[in-house]
Amino acid sequence: MDEILERVRERVEEIRDRTFTPRAGGRSLRKALSGPGVSVIAEVKPTSPSQGRLRDVDAEDVAERARAYERGGAAGISVLTEPEFFDGRPEYVEVVREAVDVPVLRKDFIIDPVQVEESAHYGADAVLIIAAAVGREAPELIDLAHEHGMEVLLEIDRWEHLELLSECDPDVVGVNNRDLRTLEVDLNRTLELGPEVKDLTNAPLVAESGVSGPEDVVLLGEVADAVLVGTYLMRAPDPSEAVRKLVEAGRSTE
């Protein structure tokens, strides 16, 4: 992740002097994930650093895939916008927002206030803040996102991150099953950290990474309120049907 963050810092300086005009958000990801069973956040992710190129996309493809996810029953759409390692684009947030009616999450390595402003400019309803990337700066970025009318999914991936939950007020909490230091995936990370998160906050809990089918949704549903799924869906020949099967599995946990 160090290499990714180094490039992110360079891009931050490239956009620092730009003027961003916030767009009204208003679609609540927290509310969308608060229903019974396990909800599905479906992700548009052209490339994975661990899996390679998943699918060639342009703006039209991104919009159509987002619509397919929504038809399948996705509660929200995650848009990976990091350009160098994931082949995303910040503009894809706006593309997806105009294509669907469900909440849109901007997923990137947000480490600076200007990126929060950029997210609001493109119409994100929520932004991802990664504890491993920002540490004690998380509360400031979360407050700024709220000031711009956006919700925040705070991502943790280790025990020491639990302390942040007493220092800030995220709308949603995610547990990344991928260790960002080794890139290894272990679904037990959610099963172990999840109950501790539930003791500290009423925010919906999202299991991120590693979902490879409906059976994983059922397993993670022991503690999670939602799953965020990217690679599995990007490889699916019928993304709408793939989401539908995950949603059905989530409903079976009610």
Curated annotation (Swiss-Prot):
Keyword entries, A-Z: Amino-acid biosynthesis, Aromatic amino acid biosynthesis, Decarboxylase, Lyase, Tryptophan biosynthesis
This protein's pathway reads:
Amino-acid biosynthesis; L-tryptophan biosynthesis; L-tryptophan from chorismate: step 4/5
PROSITE patterns cross-referenced by the UniProt entry: IGPS
Q: What is this protein called?
A: Indole-3-glycerol phosphate synthase
Q: Which family does it belong to?
A: Belongs to the TrpC family.
Instruction: Fetch the InterPro entries from UniProt.
Output: Aldolase_TIM, Indole-3-glycerol_P_synth, Indole-3-glycerol_P_synth_dom, Indole-3-GlycerolPSynthase_CS, RibuloseP-bd_barrel
Q: Which reaction(s) does the protein catalyse, per the Swiss-Prot or TrEMBL entry?
A: 1-(2-carboxyphenylamino)-1-deoxy-D-ribulose 5-phosphate + H(+) = (1S,2R)-1-C-(indol-3-yl)glycerol 3-phosphate + CO2 + H2O
- The region annotated as signal peptide is none
